[in-house]
Regions:
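A short SAM/SAH-binding and catalytic strip from SAM-dependent methyltransferases
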Residues: 125-140
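Class I (Rossmann-like) S-adenosyl-L-methionine-dependent methyltransferase catalytic domain
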Residues: 2-55, 63-117, 140, 157-210
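Conserved beta-strand/loop positions that form the S-adenosyl-L-methionine
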Residues: 60
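A short acidic, Gly/Pro-enriched loop at the edge of an enzyme's catalytic core
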Residues: 117-127
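Hydrophobic pocket-lining residues that define ligand/cofactor binding sites across diverse proteins
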Residues: 95, 136, 152
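A short glycine-rich, Lys/Arg-flanked "PGG" loop and its adjoining helix->strand segment in the class I
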Residues: 142-154
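Conserved sugar-transfer catalytic core signal across GT-A, GT-B, and GT-C glycosyltransferases
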Residues: 67, 132, 144
């Protein structure tokens, strides 16, 4: 597996997003460490908890597991949903290699909208999304977020990163659903159909049912 390779070398940008990402994860090394923003979110909300193993964190779209690896390494209990079987296998292998597997609660492979129904309501202290939800259209993303919020305990938190139209390579395509595009250059090139948000979209997506 090449550690440094561009998506254009391995992706035709054809097929479903799930198929495209399975192909990427099976041929390319991926990020192994979380963003500073994710680290700050976890630290601010949960570092002072006496027993970190009691804190349950769910990731929507764990990829190869950089975020959940960090959470597990910091002593938290982790669960996740991911399209890619290869991504999940790489995550589990990394945790096994570092003797962190005991922090894994549940990992499910499949569609977020469907798999969220398999988790109990009010069972997580936080859920996180490191850009993965952007690979769902606006309508589906809203459904997923509403379901994910129901999985939070009282006073639970969530962390989500979503792109704007200002991202490099984002070009409007009227043939695609609302505020989605299929970049062929920029950091998101050849990763499938991606949704972007303006300020109004963000309010509609994240305000919840109430």
């Amino acid at each position: 597996m090449k550690k440094y390779i561009s998506n254009i070398e391995i992706s035709t940008n054809q097929g479903t997003n799930a198929q495209i990402w399975e192909n990427i994860f099976s041929q390319k090394e991926w990020g192994k460490y979380p963003s500073e923003n994710l680290i700050r979110f976890i630290a601010k909300n949960f570092y002072n908890v006496k027993d970190r193993s009691k804190i349950n964190i769910l990731e929507l779209g764990l990829g190869t597991g950089a975020n959940l690896w960090f959470c597990a390494k910091e002593g938290f209990s982790v669960s996740g949903i991911e399209w890619s079987k290869t991504g999940v296998e790489r995550f589990k292998q990394r945790l096994e290699n570092e003797n962190l597997s005991h922090h894994i609660q549940e990992i499910k492979i499949g569609d977020y909208e469907q798999k969220l129904d398999e988790f109990e309501d009010e069972s997580f202290d936080a859920w996180i999304d490191g850009y993965s939800l952007a690979y769902n259209d606006f309508k589906k993303t809203k459904i997923i977020i509403e379901k994910a919020i129901k999985k939070l305990k009282k006073n639970g938190k969530f962390f989500s990163i979503t792109p704007s139209f200002n991202n490099e390579g984002f070009i409007k395509d009227e043939k695609l659903p609302y505020h989605t595009c299929k970049p062929t250059h920029g950091s998101d090139a050849f990763t499938g159909i991606i949704r972007y948000c303006d300020e109004k979209d963000i309010k509609q997506l994240y305000q919840g049912e109430n």
